[in-house]
Design a protein with these regions (language model features):
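GST superfamily/GST-like fold recognition
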Residues: 95-119, 127, 133
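Surface-exposed helix-capping loop/turn segments at secondary-structure junctions
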Residues: 87-96, 138-143
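Extended, well-ordered alpha-helical scaffold segments
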Residues: 73-81, 121-135
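Structural helix-adjacent loops and short alpha-helical linkers that scaffold large soluble proteins
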Residues: 39, 117-122
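Acidic/histidine-enriched, glycine/proline-rich intrinsically disordered or flexible terminal extensions
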Residues: 146-163
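GST-like domain detector, emphasizing the conserved glutathione-binding G-site
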Residues: 1-93
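Hydrophobic/aromatic-lined pockets within catalytic cores
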Residues: 34-38, 65, 90, 106-107, ...
Length: 163
C-alpha cells in the first residue's frame, strides 16, 4: 500500500529518500546507494543487460504477456548476451563487484526459468560465475526469508549484524 502511494507504477525496485525523492530504476538506485561511477566496461555490460538481455528475458519468462512472441526464439536471442559474457569471463574471469551485482539477478532469473537447459549450455564461465554468486554468503544473507513487513512492525535491518 505504501509503495503504491510513493510509486503508482507498482513495480520494484523503489527507493524513497529522506527528502521525499523517489528513485525507481535499478541502476540509479545502485548509483545512489553505492555512490559509484561506472567504468566504460561496466556501462557497456549494464547497458546491454538493461537494453538487450532483459528485453528478451522478459519475453522468454512471460511470453503470454506479449503478442506474437516465441519463447524459444527469445531464449536464443537472450543467449547471445550470455555467450558474449562467457567470452568476456574466459579472458578475464573476475569482474567488479558492482558489475556482478548488476548482472547477477538477471542471469539468475534466466537460468532458473529452465535450469536443466541452462546447465547444459556451453557457457561454462557464466555457469561458474553464477554458481560462485549463488553460493556466496552475501547472496545467502540477501535471500533470507522474512514475513511481509507491515506498518507498525519492528524495522528489519539489513544485514542483520549491522543493527
Amino acid at each position: 500500500e505504501h509503495m503504491m502511494e510513493i510509486s503508482p507504477k507498482g513495480t520494484v525496485p523503489v527507493l524513497l529518500l529522506e527528502d521525499g525523492t523517489v528513485i525507481e530504476e535499478s541502476l540509479e538506485i545502485m548509483q545512489h546507494v553505492l555512490d559509484w561511477m561506472l567504468s566504460e566496461e561496466e556501462q557497456h555490460w549494464i547497458s546491454r543487460n538493461d537494453d538487450e538481455f532483459k528485453f528478451h528475458l522478459d519475453r522468454y519468462k512471460y511470453p503470454n504477456r506479449y503478442e506474437d512472441v516465441d519463447e524459444i526464439e527469445q531464449r536464443t536471442l537472450a543467449s547471445a548476451y550470455l555467450i558474449d559474457l562467457d567470452q568476456r569471463l574466459a579472458t578475464e574471469p573476475s569482474i567488479s563487484e558492482a558489475l556482478s551485482d548488476a548482472l547477477f539477478p538477471f542471469v539468475r532469473q534466466f537460468a532458473n526459468h529452465d535450469r536443466d537447459w541452462f546447465d547444459v549450455q556451453p557457457w561454462t564461465n557464466v555457469l561458474a560465475w553464477l554458481t560462485e554468486n549463488l553460493e556466496s554468503e552475501a547472496f545467502k544473507a540477501c535471500m533470507k526469508k522474512h514475513k511481509q513487513w507491515v506498518k507498525g512492525d519492528v524495522t528489519i535491518v539489513f544485514p542483520a549484524d549491522s543493527a
